[in-house]
Structure formats: C-alpha cells, structure tokens
C-alpha cells in the first residue's frame, strides 16, 4: 500500500465546551477536564486556523442501540445520583457503580463522546475530510450491555459501524496501554474489521489481549494482539509498531482507519507503566497517516492530565502537518504545566522489561498469523443505509444577517490561517464579527483557487433543478455490513 510523507490533508475536529464540566467523582482518575485542557492548549498554539471545528450533535438512544442493547441504554438514560437506590439490581447487572460511577449528566457525557465519533465517521464517509479528530471519544472498554473501565458507550464501535456503510474493510488500531477489549469483542467474528492492539498484558486491566486471541469464525486471524511488559520505550515501540502495521496494511488493505490514541501509555501516567515520550507516541500517528487513508483519531485513556493535553495537542499538530514550538503558549491552564512549561516530556529511568528477543518472538508469531489471511476479502455491493446524522446546514452567506445564529452554528465558523491575525481584535473595529468573517471568506487568492479546483459554488434553492433533488435522494450502490 502506497505511503506518502508530509502530505497536507484536510482535518476536521469535534469539541463541545460542556465536556469538561462532567465529573466522575472525587478521587476518580478519569477526568473529562483533560479534554478542555487539550482544546485550550491547541487553540493557543493557533491550530484552530488550520482545521474545521465542529460542535458534535448529542447522539440519541436510537444511534447508541445500533450496537448496545435497548435495556442498557434505557438504564443509562434513567439513572441519576438521586435515584440510584431504585436501580441497585440493574447497576449490578450493567456493572455501574465503582470504576464506572453514576454522576450528574452521565448520559449527556456519553451523548457528546459518541456524537463526535459518529459525526466524524459520517464526514469521512462523505469525503468531506481526510482526517477527523474527536479527543472526547475512544472509550474502548464499553460492552454491548455493560459499562467497563470508565467507559459506558462504545463510541468506537458505533463509528466503525458507520464507516462500514461505505468502506469494505476498516482497520482499528489501539495504542492505549490497556487492551481494546470492547472493540475487539464487537468485531471478533467478522473479516471486515481488523482490530490491532498494543498493550500491557499480565495481571493488568482488563486481563484480555493474549497473543493467542486471534478472532473466531469468519473473523479468525482478524484480531491482532501484541502483549507488552512494563517500561517499553520509544525505540522498542517504533521497532514493533512500524513492521506490524506495514504487514497489516499489506495483508488487510483497509479503506479506512480508526486510531485510538490513549495517552496512558506515556511515561509518568498515573495508571500506566510504559515509558513512551509524546514524540514516540505521536510517531504512531505519523506512520498511520502516511498510508493516506481516511482516518479517525480518537482519545481514550490518560490519567496524568497535563501530559494528556500535551500529547493530544501535539498529535493534532501531526495530523495537520504543522510544527509547533516546545515552549508552551500561555493558556487558561498554564500553571498545570510547571515547572518547565514545555510541550515535550522526558522518559523516566525505569527498566524496559521488553527484551529484543521477546519483542522479536512476538512479532514473528504475529507475522505467521497475518500470513494466514486471505488477501483482502471481497464484499458484496449493496444499497447503503442512510447516514446516522443529517446533512450540515448550508452556506452561511445565504443566511439572514439580522437573525441571531445559534452557539452551535457559531462554533462551526473557524478562521482559516489567511483570514485573521493572531489577535482577537482586527484594527479599529475591535472584535472579529460575522460580517468581517464573510468579507474575509470571499477573498481568495489565485493560488488558493488552483489548489482547490472543487470550490463550492453558491447555489440558491430556486436554481436547483428537480432532477438534482431526485438524484440527491437516489440510493447509492455501496457496501453493506455482511
């Protein structure tokens, strides 16, 4: 499969300002506030100018039950801290209460996480972006009818199901320190999704992900597990990740990739025991990106929150092919990053218990399994189901300028690099406003026009022919989940 180096690709990014308000409870290691810290840091690096930012819709119960059981989702919708006593049996049944506590806004939190991942998949399916990013997603432990490992709704599975409407084969890669058990379980018997997980194994949550777990039935050899020991460093990780992923790409030939970027595999993580730096972790993103496939990047674990924000900010920059300085810009959470106030972290002096012999032995075993794969299974072409979410609204230039827009619409209006300066103020006019935005938007250089031959044409409803409308409603012939 062809690789490209340094190719600029269109990136869209999903974020809701409310996500940082959710709180698992005192002493709980999972802190949604880390998503807000990440967002604030990448804003202050100016990365917002280089990508489209969207506020996700709140995924509804119908979307979630494309994978999860009806009674489990109904339970998540109903449970609250003030009515827990009425649901004690169901809490036990659905594994909610300890690692996965009941907290205020639990279901809304799941809606935002899931909404961003599903919307990202729809964007990729419509070829409206090359890379989609949702750092609030990546909750890989959730099962069909059970919460697990701080995860309630498996946004990854739901996003992959959406991708499968348009893509014959989807590759899932997991670089979280914990095994991606929930995603593997969901696709264990299909040959249309390959799951690849690099994780700590042996007396460590969730206890799954043995080298010998390879899938079943049609899915035999489509689950790939690389069990690791404590202390793996950048050099060792790169030495296994690149050859394994190259072989996977060659044998499976996916047409879309989902990369779970759990940052608990970093050195110094509160719950982790690996020794990766941010650069080492991001090399995985860079390598997967080089295959030039539609890519969904998701969050996941990460419990030293200052390093989570550093890591996901840097990996957003990698997706954008943008260099950012090691000196952190001033931001709302600047004091979290002391005493050095730098982007990158140093590895610790912990021992790497993964010897070269051990890593080579596991790698060769995985290669043997991958050689058992038939080359790129074919899939029957079928009419595709409709998208999970409706079309985005039309051109803002056609809107009534006297009508106040919603916060959601406002969040989608992102300044491109050439449109605004670093400052929030433009000359004597003070703050940026909608009319300035529109004027700037209309100004296009000849260069840009050459780069963007498929420039959107402004078309009014009256100009659309009935024939075009009929065509838009037509059923596309594409693949359907077998």
Curated annotation (Swiss-Prot):
Q: Which residues carry this modification: Phosphoserine?
A: 393, 406, 409, 421, 423
Where found? Nucleus
Binding-site positions, Zn(2+): 176, 178, 264
Provide the positions where the record notes the PTM N6-acetyllysine.
Answer: 74, 220
Assigned keywords, A-Z: Acetylation, Biological rhythms, Chromatin regulator, Hydrolase, Isopeptide bond, Metal-binding, Methylation, Nucleus, Phosphoprotein, Repressor, S-nitrosylation, Transcription, Transcription regulation, Ubl conjugation, Zinc
**Active site, per annotation:** 141
Activity-regulation annotation: Inositol tetraphosphate (1D-myo-inositol 1,4,5,6-tetrakisphosphate) may act as an intermolecular glue between HDAC1 and N-Cor repressor complex components.
Which family is it part of? Belongs to the histone deacetylase family. HD type 1 subfamily.
Q: What is this protein called?
A: Histone deacetylase 1
Q: Say which species the protein is native to.
A: Bos taurus (Bovine)
Q: What is the lineage of its organism?
A: Eukaryota, Metazoa, Chordata, Craniata, Vertebrata
């Amino acid at each position: 499969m062809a690789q490209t180096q340094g190719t600029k690709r269109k990136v869209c990014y999903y974020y809701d300002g409310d996500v940082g308000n959710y709180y698992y409870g005192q002493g709980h290691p999972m802190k949604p506030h880390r998503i807000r810290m990440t967002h604030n840091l990448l804003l202050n690096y100016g990365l917002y100018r280089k990508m489209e930012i969207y506020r996700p819709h709140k995924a509804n119960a119908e979307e979630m039950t494309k994978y999860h059981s009806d009674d489990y989702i109904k339970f998540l919708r109903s449970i609250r801290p003030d009515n827990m006593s009425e649901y004690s049996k169901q809490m036990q049944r659905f594994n909610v209460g300890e690692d996965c506590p009941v907290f205020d806004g639990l279901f809304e939190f799941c809606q935002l996480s899931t909404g961003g991942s599903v919307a990202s998949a729809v964007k990729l399916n419509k070829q409206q972006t090359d890379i989609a990013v949702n750092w609030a997603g990546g909750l890989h432990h959730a099962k069909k009818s059970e919460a697990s490992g701080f995860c309630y709704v498996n946004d990854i599975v739901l996003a992959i199901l959406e991708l499968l409407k348009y893509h014959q084969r989807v590759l899932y890669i997991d670089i979280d320190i914990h095994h991606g058990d929930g995603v593997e379980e969901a696709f264990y018997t299909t040959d249309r999704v390959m799951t690849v997980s690099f994780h700590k194994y042996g007396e460590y949550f969730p206890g799954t992900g043995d080298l010998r777990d390879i899938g079943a039935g049609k899915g035999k050899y489509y689950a790939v597990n690389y069990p690791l020991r404590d202390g793996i460093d950048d050099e060792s990780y790169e030495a296994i990740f690149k050859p394994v992923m190259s072989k996977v790409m060659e044998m499976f030939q996916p047409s879309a990739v989902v990369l779970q970027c759990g940052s608990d595999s970093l050195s110094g993580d509160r719950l982790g025991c690996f020794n990766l730096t941010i650069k080492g972790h991001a090399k995985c993103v860079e390598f997967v990106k080089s295959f030039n496939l539609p890519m969904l990047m998701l969050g996941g674990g990460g419990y030293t929150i200052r390093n989570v924000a550093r890591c996901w900010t840097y990996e957003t920059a990698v997706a954008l092919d943008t260099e950012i300085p090691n000196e952190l810009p001033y931001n709302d959470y600047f004091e979290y990053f002391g005493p050095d106030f730098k982007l990158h972290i140093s590895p610790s002096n912990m021992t790497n218990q993964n010897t070269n012999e051990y890593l080579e032995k596991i790698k060769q075993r995985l290669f043997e399994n991958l050689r058992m794969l038939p080359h790129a299974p074919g899939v029957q072409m079928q009419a595709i189901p409709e998208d999970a979410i409706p079309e985005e609204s039309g051109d803002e230039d056609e809107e009534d300028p006297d009508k106040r827009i919603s916060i959601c619409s406002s969040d989608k209006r992102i300044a491109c690099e050439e449109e605004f300066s670093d400052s929030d103020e433009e000359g004597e006019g003070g703050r940026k406003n909608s009319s300035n935005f529109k004027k700037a938007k209309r100004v296009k250089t000849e260069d840009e026009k050459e780069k963007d031959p498929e420039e959107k044409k402004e078309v009014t409803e009256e100009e659309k022919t009935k024939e075009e409308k009929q065509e838009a409603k037509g059923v596309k012939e594409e693949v359907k989940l077998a």
